[in-house]
Amino acid sequence: MTINYQFGDVDDHGAMIRAQAGLLEAEHQAIIRDVLTASDFWGGAGSAACQGFITQLGRNFQVIYEQANAHGQKVQAAGNNMAQTDSAVGSSWA
């Protein structure tokens, strides 16, 4: 009986997570544009409230980006470790 693991799929999944993290910047910029368009809500684009909201939004996006990127790296590392272990075990049985 042969078991065929697709370690490349795990690596691809990790890469996809990291790519999605990178795409967050475009979403972040789009939200900032919308906030600036509606800046009257906070008292104008230059107001402390508006700038504070934009700053906090940036911090939140940074945390999400860092966590998603780190998770993608961990998924890729796990896939690589499984592939190496599988290869080592497989060669010891040969």
From Swiss-Prot:
Statement: the UniProt record of this protein carries the keyword Secreted: yes
Listed Gene3D superfamilies: ESAT-6-like
Note the subunit structure. Answer: Strongly interacts with EsxK to form a heterodimeric complex under reducing conditions.
Q: Which domain of life is it from?
A: Bacteria
Name of protein: ESAT-6-like protein EsxL
Which family would the database say this protein is a member of?
Belongs to the WXG100 family. ESAT-6 subfamily.
InterPro entries xref list: ESAT-6-like_Myco, ESAT-6-like_sf, T7SS_ESAT-6-like
Key words of the record:
Secreted
The record's annotation in SUPFAM superfamilies points to: EsxAB dimer-like
Q: Where in the cell is it found?
A: Secreted
GO CC, sorted alphabetically, is: extracellular region
| Location (main, coarse) | secreted
Q: Which Pfam families match?
A: WXG100
